[in-house]
């Protein structure tokens, strides 16, 4: 019998939100609205769509394995050198690269709980000990407790800010104080997948911190605000020395041709991003007002989703909404058994969803 790694037996494949077509078929619905996967309801930039029309003619050719054009544009946009960037098949792959490069059975890694599931998933595959630290009551990371969990065997500490699934963030003051205390032998990863949506004035600009903290790595993505989730383009920003050290763990041709072209074009259309952020803030207010009106607790969000406590079994409410044509994310698998995580849709989608929800409370 094949001897599969023992640690894989405690894992299950990542469970994304239900596909729209599957829900239509299952419940015989003509219209289904997906508010589960924190996708951009406004799609992507027209410039990205135009770039795809050109690039699709080259699908028989392998992509640029170094993503040179995108890397150059991205470096200019971020104000860093090209050698400070590693590109991946979504930030999921960059997380995998980090884990593959640093973690082993003799090491441990520290993270919040609940937070993005792929930090733990990849650490378990590498055989590392996972040290999880509960969130504070306000949904933020307990950074002091995370520091206490670090020891000589710790290789990576993960900070998801804004955090998924709470939408909460770490202030600049708190994050810098934390980074000052992280030992030099530990890589501090700050996952900023929702960076573009953040409006909090005390949210830190982390890229300038790279010079001060050579053991810092920042993760960002084109899947959220840029609306390119299906094309899988994410990236990490760190010191040149760190990027060079982990590059061998990257798969060849890992960022596909269409993704590179669309991301390159999308970077040039920041007006689209600003418009999406404005609409997202208006959408968040719709949810906040609804919660205040109905006495529901929620975590104020710096993302394009909101986590709401309905004081009832999340799976049951999820199933009821599914039958009515709304796909959301049950908090049961996210560590919040009475909460739903709801992606912010268009104004019309939000209105329809909240009207349906009001009739179920």
Curated annotation (Swiss-Prot):
Name the Enzyme Commission number(s) assigned to this protein: 2.6.1.9
Q: Which cofactor does it need?
A: pyridoxal 5'-phosphate
Q: What class of enzyme is it?
A: transferase
The UniProt keyword set, sorted, is: Amino-acid biosynthesis, Aminotransferase, Histidine biosynthesis, Pyridoxal phosphate, Transferase
Which InterPro entries does this one have?
Aminotrans_II_pyridoxalP_BS, Aminotransferase_I/II_large, HisP_aminotrans, HistidinolP_aminotransfase, PyrdxlP-dep_Trfase, PyrdxlP-dep_Trfase_major, PyrdxlP-dep_Trfase_small
What is said about its interaction partners and assembly? Homodimer.
**Entry GO MF terms:** histidinol-phosphate transaminase activity; pyridoxal phosphate binding
Lineage of this protein's species?
Answer: Bacteria, Bacillati, Bacillota, Bacilli, Bacillales
Originating organism: Bacillus licheniformis (strain ATCC 14580 / DSM 13 / JCM 2505 / CCUG 7422 / NBRC 12200 / NCIMB 9375 / NCTC 10341 / NRRL NRS-1264 / Gibson 46)
Pathway named in the protein's UniProt entry: Amino-acid biosynthesis; L-histidine biosynthesis; L-histidine from 5-phospho-alpha-D-ribose 1-diphosphate: step 7/9
* Residues that bear N6-(pyridoxal phosphate)lysine: 224
Q: Does the keyword Cell inner membrane apply?
A: no
**This protein's encoding gene:** hisC
Stored Gene3D superfamilies: Aspartate Aminotransferase, domain 1 (3.90.1150.10), Type I PLP-dependent aspartate aminotransferase-like (Major domain) (3.40.640.10)
What GO biological process terms does the UniProt entry carry, in alphabetical order?
L-histidine biosynthetic process
Query: What is the protein name for this chain?
Result: Histidinol-phosphate aminotransferase
Per its record, the protein catalyses: L-histidinol phosphate + 2-oxoglutarate = 3-(imidazol-4-yl)-2-oxopropyl phosphate + L-glutamate
